[in-house]
């Protein structure tokens, strides 16, 4: 069983193929704001390197953000289109869940994801469930609001652990998978 993970929420495009729940190939490419040019060729290359066909993919996982508005939309559209056209299950994960699920043992507490002008913050319980809405804080607001708060530290994403947790989620109708927008688009401010 092959699974595909697509993550385009920040400056890197990450595409991973899992076989029976373990990472067998991964592409992580610094995109320099060229997600739309890089993501599909990276996916095709990844699949070709494994000698499989696109139809061999049994399910798709996509990071829905928060993160780069354009980056997230690109990954979500590709994942939704593939899931719909190939009639494959799709599951979504948000950027903070990627951190939570990377841990060997799930840990309750505050998690944060860096963004160019601040942080996305969420609180999770010991089962990896989001307790509150993910919120965005500028660096100044963050330093004021969370001055004496401790955050759970995740040094490195563990994609095998992420897979083991996200695969437990119920698949979603591809038409219902949407980017997670937390802050307002800059141009609308």
Report residues per predicted region.
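Oxyanion-binding and handling regions
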Residues: 1-22, 91-189
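N-terminal beta-alpha supersecondary unit
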Residues: 1-58, 135-136
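A general structural signal for well-ordered alpha-helical segments in protein cores
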Residues: 36-40, 79, 159-160
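Buried hydrophobic packing segments
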Residues: 43, 78-82, 100
């Amino acid at each position: 069983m092959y699974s595909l993970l697509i993550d385009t929420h920040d400056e890197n495009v990450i595409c991973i193929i899992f076989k029976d729940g373990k990472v067998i190939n991964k592409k992580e490419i610094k995109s320099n704001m060229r997600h739309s040019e890089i993501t599909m060729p990276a996916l095709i290359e990844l699949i070709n390197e494994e000698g499989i066909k696109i139809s061999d993919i049994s399910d798709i996982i996509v990071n829905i953000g928060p993160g780069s508005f354009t980056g997230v939309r690109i990954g979500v559209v590709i994942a939704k289109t593939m899931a719909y056209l190939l009639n494959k299950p799709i599951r979504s994960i948000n950027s903070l869940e990627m951190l939570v699920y990377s841990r060997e043992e799930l840990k309750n507490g505050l998690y944060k994801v860096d963004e160019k002008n601040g942080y996305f913050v969420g609180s999770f319980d010991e089962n990896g469930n989001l307790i509150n809405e993910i919120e965005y804080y500028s660096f100044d607001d963050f330093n004021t609001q969370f001055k004496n708060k401790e955050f759970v530290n995740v040094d490195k994403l563990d994609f095998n652990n992420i897979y083991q947790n996200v695969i437990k989620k119920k698949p979603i109708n591809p038409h219902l998978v949407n980017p997670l927008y937390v802050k307002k688009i800059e141009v609308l401010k």
